[in-house]
Amino acid sequence: MISDETFAKQERLIKTKDFRKVYKDGRSYRAGFIILRLLPNAALMNRVGFSISAQSIKRAFRRNRIKRLFREAYRRNKNILRKGFDIVFVVRRDFKENFSYAEAQQVFLNLSKQAGILL
């Protein structure tokens, strides 16, 4: 049996109004330099977005790398998360440069457990 480890378009938070709603009405959980914002939705799947300001991390290639790491951590672990949430990962200014995938996955799992969405 092949597991579904894709990151489909329907799973992405893209619209500004969706991000604003999660910021306004969602709950926050923090682990170091990452904040997870969580809001229940009416869908049968999770939708995920990433927020990294250019003011906090100046170089685009660094911002993109961080997003890739957390996108991969979500993609590989989404089957062990409860469904029906809009999730936004916010990266703060004190992010360290040499961050690995293993560290991203550990932070992702810790935040998911803290938020109560880990099965």
Where are these regions (language model features)?
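Positively charged, solvent-exposed patches that mediate nucleic-acid binding
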Residues: 1-119
